[in-house]
Amino acid sequence: MKKVFLIVLFSLFIVFLNFTINSCSPEEKIIEKQMIQISDEELIEKNSAIYKTREINGKERKFLSSDFSRIEKPSSLDEFTQYFHNPPLRQHRTGTCWSFATTSFLESELKRLEKGDVKLSEIYTVYWEYVEKARGFIKQKGKQSLGQGSEHNAVTERMKKYGAVPASAYSGLLRGQEEHNHSKLFREIRNYLTFCKENKYWDEEKAISYVKSILNKHLGTPPETIEVDGKSMTPKEYLENVLQLPLDDYVCFMSLKSLPFYTKGEYKVPDNWWHSEEYYNVPLDEFFDAIVNSLKNGHTVALGGDVSEPGISSAEDIAIVPTYDILQKLIDQDSREFRFYNRTSTDDHAIHAVG
């Protein structure tokens, strides 16, 4: 049975448009109309847009948000059905949500598959993703996006090539460090690869060796062997013989009108820097049903979405679709497509849905 990664383009995917067709006599031209019924309550209970401030890089910045004071929200996570997941970890000052979310998903899968409670290293995968990203940049002679972000299926692809290790074997933190911060690390990688591009220096072996030296300086050298239950093994042996994750069973879905439905194609966002075309494209109702049915049947789901919308607040721990943005009944395949097309909404964060 296939398990799923699901790429959610933004937080407005949860409600759909109902369709009705006008009745007409045979001689009349048939016209299909989309009818939307909006109740008085929905017009009254509108949300207010307000400006808030927060500190970004030491400076106070204004940003558009919502007034959440009148919104009723659940009082506790105990109100929800939850499946096993390890406690959430902070990615701190890194762009590695893709690894943290997907690693958490795979840990939940290990528990579901009766492999026990396992805590894997997110940064081990990040290390090799940065290496592969640099390799791609050199191979493409600089014609490739370069950032810390990536996609869910990068984790499974890097595991297939480099294996996996427990978090205890590789933290990605140097002695005395308590928080991840890849700002300086990635700046050094970017500066070096920019130098390569400007000087047309495309020696892949030497370039990757230098990038690894930067990574080793900031993250520590990843282990070539690890010890598990008294046995020494490589990261690939740990993945294949101990974890035994069915990595080929995990697939990506998206819902976009730019590609024919029921085909596979490329998810065109910067974080899909290697132009993976392994995304199954399905209509929005089936896309949504896949999420709901997975959760109802005991599977957790790795999601990609937009958390920079004004209806989302981490401080309030709440997410809504504000009425000043778009009424929920107007959200459908087309409105979603329009927002993705004009970049109002995009894919800027990965999360793990656990119930």
Where are the language model's segments positioned?
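Bacterial N-terminal signal peptides
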Residues: 8-18
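Bacterial Sec-dependent signal peptides at the C-terminal "C-region" and cleavage site
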Residues: 16-29
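Positively charged n-region of N-terminal signal peptides that target proteins for export
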Residues: 1-4
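Catalytic-core signature of thiol
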Residues: 26-354
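Short amphipathic alpha-helical "recognition" segments used for binding
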Residues: 6-7, 111
